[in-house]
Amino acid sequence: NHSYSDSRIKITRLDKNYGIAGNMNEAIKISTGDYIALYDHDDTLEPQTLFEFVQLLNENPNIQVIYSDEDKINEDGSTYFQPHFKPDFNIDLLCSVNYICHFFMVSKTIVNEVGLLDSAFDGAQDYDFIFRCTERAGSENIYHIPHALYHWRMHQASTAENPESKMYAFDAGTRAIQAHYDRVGIHATVEKGK
């Protein structure tokens, strides 16, 4: 694997499992770049993904948050399906569903301001993190790349294959929305849909 010879890529083995958010936080802590990109270990990116993100940043240095479209990929990586074509940033839609999900990149400055992923939201830790980052960035500094650059791998234990495989994620997602409303001063009670 050529990535092992690239000094910018760091591989570390944790002494224990810190949970979904905790493990990601350990990776963020050792990062040295100006941007953080959230990426699940079993998913894949198009070869030009990072190029497209960096090109956008070079052309628009005020951008703080970037996300792309995505699709799903089968377990052996041979079939792509269920493309998810996302809209440009829409806070009202985000308050009803985590449509951003993958691939998400945020400036390290924003991360330093909003803090790391919160393990209290494990299962929807990315949803809570996306809310906090977009709140801080402001809609004018959020950009959507309308290309399926991220491929979410489906397997029996994944929420891509079976959203009900991790019911705790629904509860955590509800709490993430409520936390967002609380932070921005909107008096609301979030309930799960029926």
Please describe what each predicted stretch is:
Residues 14-31:
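Glycine-rich, basic loop-to-helix element that forms the pyrophosphate-binding segment
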Residues 21, 29, 79-109, 122:
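A recurrent flexible, glycine/aromatic-enriched loop bordering the glycosyltransferase active site
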Residues 40-44, 69:
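The conserved acidic donor/metal-binding loop of glycosyltransferases
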Residues 48-80, 155:
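Conserved donor NDP-sugar-binding/catalytic core segment of glycosyltransferases
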Residues 36:
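Short aromatic/hydrophobic "clamp" motif used to bind/position activated sugar donors
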